[in-house]
């Protein structure tokens, strides 16, 4: 996967390219990340990248010319057809379904806004989709872009050692993840659930599904409203609720 980034602070993306799972993916050639700084496309000695908004009001907008030139240069450098995304509070909220949709693209170009945002005409002419990571305001689009890269890259073949990890994590099936345990067997007088030590894979699968359903019911009940539960899932959830209330 190729990811291009338009940002006034490209150095921030070293945390993606140099560390963790994404850093390893870059080293292996599974993920390619390139950055373009609009400051490099300015024509004045101050390298100005902001401008006043029409109509007045607080704050500034990103200057059109350097931003557009950076976007068009990045598009030309992309290895193929590229989806252009603007990280924006007005965009579609990123969720697991959205992550999986974005992961089907071989090339993504992410535009990170700053100040009060960008000229609406740039969005209309250069952007394919707007995406948000939540209903809150941040100082720029860099951290949302990193979030998107991290979540989407998990679905690039070879990035995770076990691809099933991406399919079984929280939200992959619309549910929160079940609890997990490792050694020691007893920690602060709390034992690992006996079913996980039983070796019975059928019982372990049912326990994990039950806990996943129950945790979703307890913490994010609104997620269940959008799911069509199977008969088995309905039964396991009913058992969990009964146990909680007994």
From Swiss-Prot:
Q: Which domain of life is it from?
A: Bacteria
Q: Where on this chain does S-adenosyl-L-methionine bind? A: 113, 133-138
What Pfam families does UniProt report for this protein, alphabetically? tRNA_m1G_MT (PF01746)
A single Gene Ontology molecular function, please?
A: tRNA (guanine(37)-N1)-methyltransferase activity
GO cellular component terms attached to this protein's record = cytosol
Where does the signal peptide begin and end?
Answer: none
Could you tell me the Gene Ontology terms of the biological process aspect for this record? tRNA N1-guanine methylation
Keywords recorded for this protein, A-Z? Cytoplasm, Methyltransferase, S-adenosyl-L-methionine, Transferase, tRNA processing
Q: Where in the cell is it found?
A: Cytoplasm
> Quick check: keyword S-adenosyl-L-methionine in the entry?
yes
Note the CDD domains from the entry. Answer: TrmD-like
Subunit (UniProt):
Homodimer.
Regarding protein family, the annotation reads: Belongs to the RNA methyltransferase TrmD family.
The entry's function note states:
Specifically methylates guanosine-37 in various tRNAs.
Protein name from the UniProt record: tRNA (guanine-N(1)-)-methyltransferase
Q: Which organism is it from?
A: Vibrio atlanticus (strain LGP32) (Vibrio splendidus (strain Mel32))
């Amino acid at each position: 996967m190729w990811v291009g980034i338009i940002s006034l602070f490209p150095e921030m993306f070293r945390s993606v390219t140099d560390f963790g799972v994404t850093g390893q993916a870059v080293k292996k050639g599974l993920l390619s990340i390139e950055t373009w700084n609009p400051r490099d496309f300015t024509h004045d000695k101050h390298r100005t990248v902001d401008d006043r908004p029409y109509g007045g009001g607080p704050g500034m907008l990103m200057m059109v010319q350097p931003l557009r030139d950076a976007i068009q240069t990045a598009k030309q450098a992309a290895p193929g057809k590229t989806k252009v995304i603007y990280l924006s509070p007005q965009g579609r909220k990123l969720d697991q379904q959205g992550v999986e949709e974005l992961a089907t693209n071989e090339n993504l170009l992410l535009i990170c806004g700053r100040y009060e945002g960008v000229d609406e005409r740039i969005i209309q002419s250069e952007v394919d989709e707007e995406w948000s990571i939540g209903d809150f305001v941040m100082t720029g689009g860099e951290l949302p872009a990193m979030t998107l890269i991290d979540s989407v890259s998990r679905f690039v073949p070879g990035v995770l050692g076990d691809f099933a990890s991406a399919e079984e994590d929280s939200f992959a099936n619309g549910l929160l993840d079940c609890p997990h345990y490792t050694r020691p067997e007893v920690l602060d007088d709390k034992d690992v659930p006996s079913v996980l030590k039983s070796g019975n894979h059928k019982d372990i699968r049912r326990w994990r599904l039950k806990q996943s359903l129950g945790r979703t019911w307890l913490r994010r009940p609104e997620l269940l409203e959008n799911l069509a539960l199977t008969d088995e899932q309905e039964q396991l959830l009913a058992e969990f609720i009964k146990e909680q209330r007994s």
